[in-house]
């Protein structure tokens, strides 16, 4: 007796046997029951979700000897022949192998003949999107008005490739990909009926690897049965799929949570020795993190497939804060997205896990715990005294002056500690900058520390450190949020961007125009004229010379293209209306820089404001403090008046 694979043996024989796709089955069953049967159906969806199976069930319901029904008998000759694939009036066509227009025409030549055995002649065209354009054109007329005894059932995995004229002539049903639980439940039912031993975790792995396709899941199950010597075991499925078992993936998660870098690298070496698929490793860890998060939300969310590691999963759900869990999940998720760009897949996984360790939320600060009790040992390492800089080779400690007072050292260490906790510590730029900060004479930083120490001597030094909890070290970026908000109040980002791009904001342009009106009578007169924008540019780029009713405008030669007879007439009319007398206007080209035009007045005022802005920035106490203590460099070219 020949063996029949599970995917063929367990093909649905009734609508009730179909897994999922209730939205499609309900519509088809109601149509068959009511007798409202369309002449063309299109089933679309990914591979292995039941497109061809549902089409055959529909053909069985149309040609059952008991009548058109949603529940065919399955015992009549027509039903049995359809199940066996030898029903003469069910013509199945593989469009991928018959793409030529001649094949389509041969098919349509037989449409006119009545069915030989059944009630309807059913044409089942699989992968219909593979037909050529000419084949679609040949099919259009028949598909729109077929004979009463003909039904078309089309199936495709890519409906976007079908012409809209074909889509408009069909009832389209899109079949959804099955979820993991639906596939797992069906596999469990089939294996129980086949009396094959199986493990819940193995079915979970097979269901996830099927990626929504029940046919793929059954094919993988056949392979797993062969690999497991007649049973479906987790070990055999993991080896077949190239995935880690739960214990190894969970051990990696535990090592990351415990910030145990050596354990992480050891587990990665073990995974490499097994020839693991690296992306599958990240997927498995992400799946475990998801299950832990679900257990935190609902303790009953842990299914029976996790029985072997249930205790460890619940312990992680109890001890790991939800915020930390989300951080690990996001880190691994981003690492998986960046994996194709890594020089090597293993390298990408290692860097992802190292990133998770680097951003460990509960990582202690790099400094030892001893400064919390006493800051005295910190003084020699926190501040480099001047003699150490001048005599680096002197071994005798007597040559160095006395260290800073204990209170000053405590304040310095506390300040450094608080800066690290708040995320404001900046990397020093260069060694010369470090040397300039350690000048032995007139060091205002030391003077400031001395003044601060007088104010904090009465306060216990350890209290300064207690204000910075170590647990929040990983969330340094939050400290920058108020700074951004305060900047937005001063000027909008759009205005600042325009200013830095050498563009004047509308507010600044209005100020410059107002001041130009105060300084230049001709600019004031232009502001009172009612002119089109193009004509106004003529007036703004010229200076006026008047003798009685004769007005001469001296236009810059670079703007000669603005001068036209129409512009002169409109400008003369506007001047006449403003003065109440007839003005005789002439325009000549003149590049004399001694007299400014209104636009040149605005530019001159802008230069004055720019010079004032530079002086104000340079003289600002805060800027001077930054330059003195942090060796900041002022980019004067970026200064713009706002």
UniProtKB/Swiss-Prot annotation:
DNA polymerase III is a complex, multichain enzyme responsible for most of the replicative synthesis in bacteria. This DNA polymerase also exhibits 3' to 5' exonuclease activity. Its EC number is 2.7.7.7. Residues 416-425 have a biased composition (Polar residues). CDD domains: AAA, HLD_clamp_pol_III_gamma_tau. This is DNA polymerase III subunit tau. ATP binds at residues 45-52. Residues 394-404 have a biased composition (Pro residues). GO terms for biological process: DNA-templated DNA replication; viral translational frameshifting.
């Amino acid at each position: 007796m020949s063996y029949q694979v599970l995917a063929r043996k367990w093909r649905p024989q009734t609508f009730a046997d179909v897994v999922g796709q209730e939205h499609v089955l309900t519509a088809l069953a109601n149509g068959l029951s009511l007798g409202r049967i369309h002449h063309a159906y299109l089933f679309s969806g990914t591979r292995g979700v039941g497109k061809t199976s549902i089409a055959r069930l529909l053909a069985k319901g149309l040609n059952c000897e008991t009548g058109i029904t949603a529940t065919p008998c399955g015992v009549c000759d027509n039903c049995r022949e359809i199940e066996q694939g030898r029903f003469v009036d069910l013509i199945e066509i593989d469009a991928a192998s018959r793409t030529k227009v001649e094949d389509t025409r041969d098919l349509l030549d037989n449409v006119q003949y009545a069915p030989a055995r059944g009630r309807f002649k059913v044409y089942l065209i699989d992968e219909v999107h593979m037909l050529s354009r000419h084949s679609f054109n040949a099919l259009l007329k028949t598909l729109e008005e077929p004979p009463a005894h003909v039904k078309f059932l089309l199936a495709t995995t890519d409906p976007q490739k079908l012409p809209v004229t074909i889509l408009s002539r069909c009832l389209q049903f899109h079949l959804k990909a099955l979820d993991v639980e639906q596939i797992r439940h069906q596999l469990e039912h089939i294996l129980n009926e086949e009396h094959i031993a199986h493990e819940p975790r193995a079915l979970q792995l097979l269901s996830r690897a099927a990626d929504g396709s029940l046919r793929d899941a059954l094919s993988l199950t056949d392979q797993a049965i062969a690999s497991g010597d007649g049973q479906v075991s987790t070990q055999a499925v993991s080896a077949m799929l190239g995935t880690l078992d739960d214990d190894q993936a969970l051990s990696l998660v535990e090592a990351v949570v415990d910030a145990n870098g050596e354990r992480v690298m050891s587990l990665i070496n073990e995974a490499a020795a097994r020839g693991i698929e690296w992306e599958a490793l990240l997927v498995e860890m992400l799946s475990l993190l998801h299950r832990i998060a679900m257990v935190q939300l609902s303790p009953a969310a842990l299914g029976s497939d996790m029985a072997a590691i249930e205790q460890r999963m619940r312990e992680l759900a109890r001890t790991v804060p939800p915020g930390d869990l989300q951080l690990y999940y996001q880190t691994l998720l981003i690492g998986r997205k960046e994996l194709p760009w890594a020089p090597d897949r293993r390298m990408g996984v290692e860097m992802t896990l190292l990133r998770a360790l680097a951003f460990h939320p509960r990582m202690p600060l790099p400094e030892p715990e001893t400064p919390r009790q006493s800051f005295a040992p910190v003084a020699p390492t926190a501040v480099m005294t001047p003699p150490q800089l001048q005599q680096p080779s002197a071994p005798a400690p007597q040559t160095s002056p006395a260290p800073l007072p204990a209170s000053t050292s405590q304040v310095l260490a506390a300040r450094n500690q608080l800066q690290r906790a708040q995320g404001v510590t900046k990397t020093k730029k260069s060694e010369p900058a470090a040397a300039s900060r350690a000048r032995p004479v007139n060091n205002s930083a030391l003077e400031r520390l001395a003044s601060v120490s007088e104010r904090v001597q009465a306060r216990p030094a350890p209290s300064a450190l207690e204000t910075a909890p170590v647990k929040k070290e990983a969330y340094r970026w939050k400290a920058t949020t108020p700074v951004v908000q305060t900047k937005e109040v001063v000027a909008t980002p759009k205005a600042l961007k325009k200013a830095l791009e050498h563009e004047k904001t509308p507010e600044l342009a209005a100020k410059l125009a107002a001041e130009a009106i105060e300084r230049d009578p001709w600019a004031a007169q232009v502001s009172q004229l009612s002119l089109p924008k193009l004509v106004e540019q003529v007036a703004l780029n010229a200076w006026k010379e008047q003798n009685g009713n004769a007005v001469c405008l001296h236009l810059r030669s670079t703007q000669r293209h603005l001068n036209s007879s129409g512009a002169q007439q409109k400008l003369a009319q506007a001047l006449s209306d403003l003065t109440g007398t007839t003005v005789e206007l002439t325009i000549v080209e003149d590049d004399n820089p001694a007299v400014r035009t209104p636009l040149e007045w605005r530019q001159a005022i802008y230069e004055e404001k720019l010079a004032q802005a530079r002086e104000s920035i340079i003289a600002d106490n805060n800027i001077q403090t930054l330059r003195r203590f942090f060796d900041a460099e002022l980019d004067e070219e970026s200064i713009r008046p706002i």
